[in-house]
Amino acid sequence: MIGKRGAGLALLGAGVIGLTAGCGTQTAPATTPSLHRQTAPLSTSLVTPQGTWAVTVMGGSATSENNFWQVFVRPAGASRWSLVTPEGVADNGGLVATGGAGGTSVLVGFRPSQALAFSPLAVSSDTGKNWTPGLLDADLADVPDAMAAAPSGQTLALLSDGSIEAAATAGAAAAGQWSRLTTLSALAASAPGRSCGLEAVNAVSFGINNVPMAAGSCVRRGVAGVFADTGGAWQAAGPVLPGGFGGDQVQVLGLTRTADGNAALLAAGSDLLAAWSDGGHWTVSGPVASGGVSASGFGADGSVWVLLGGGRAETISGPGSSWQALPPVPAGTAALAPGAGSGGYDALAVSGSKLTVWQLTAGAWAKVQVINVPIQYGSSS
């Protein structure tokens, strides 16, 4: 379903280096409108050279701490999913996952719960068969793109207070050797932060040449808050949106690295936009009406998927393409994941401790797998 402003909006924006467009070129308004912050839920999927990963919550009520977050993987070349949640750490607070350095591993962070004040980490280089523990002595943010790793091994972690921590290598991250890259107040006080009225950081990533990036929610209407740390100074690095969005506050719900640059998911008023950067310019999709995002994620090729209300799901394959509505998803669908073959999607539906995998075949959802997760209700209370 396409939103009110039409489709196929391809616009040139600022690159990471020598940026002259985006929020850094505009002056903040004299009066500051209020902002209702939007973020993407933690349930998501991601694709690495090892395979396709999904993160979702199962079990029962979060109030009684019977919610248990799980990690599933479908190894590259395989058609079936496996439960590979790292053991030994309470995961009621949620899980955040990102591809590790060079795509040879996956890094999972545990959001604090049960009075923990830090975020345990786990790294696997064998599709979740074995996990090596690590530590972030702080609390990860409650967003799916709260961690990012560059091919060089440098790792970023977004904290719940909007600060960003950095580790020089994957080994340093696992050893708990993190240092402060910036804070929300410092980023908001920078030139691009002031000009867009930055109020929250929602995602971290890396751009070309391993440049650290951050994205968030801005008060100034019509401005997408994406920032790049080049040479120790933050610069505007986001897309310029078409004039039809000049009256909408824009919030970046997701940001990820792609083979050519970056992909982003943005909320602009009641619409969603996808955007892709090749490091020199951005291409912005046409809008799709939102009504609220219940889950979202990216494919390895820059594709984007979103779960919306009422069983709606929309996908877009990349620059120059349009949003496509999938058939209504099966009841309980918590996340989508790119299918094992060319094109298509899997829907991962949750009912208590049972995960049902549905595959989109010939325009209809077909049940292909059921995984019963051994959940010990009451073990966290």
Stretches found by the model and what they are:
Residues 74-75, 124-125, 165-172, 227-231, ...:
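Conserved Ser/Thr-centered positions that define the repeating blades of beta-propeller domains
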Residues 48-56, 102-108, 152-157, 208-215, ...:
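Entry beta-strands of beta-propeller and related beta-repeat scaffolds
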Residues 58-65, 110-116, 162-164, 217-222, ...:
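Short glycine/acidic-enriched loop and turn motifs that connect beta-strands
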Residues 34-71, 91-97:
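Beta-strand-rich domains and repeat architectures in extracellular enzymes and scaffolds
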Residues 19-22:
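C-terminal motif of bacterial Sec signal peptides marking the signal peptidase cleavage site
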Residues 24-26:
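Bacterial signal peptide processing site
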Residues 38-47, 89-101, 139-151, 189-206, ...:
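Repeated scaffold domains used in trafficking and secretory/extracellular systems
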Residues 336-381:
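Blade-level signature of beta-propeller repeat domains, shared across WD40, Kelch, NHL, RCC1
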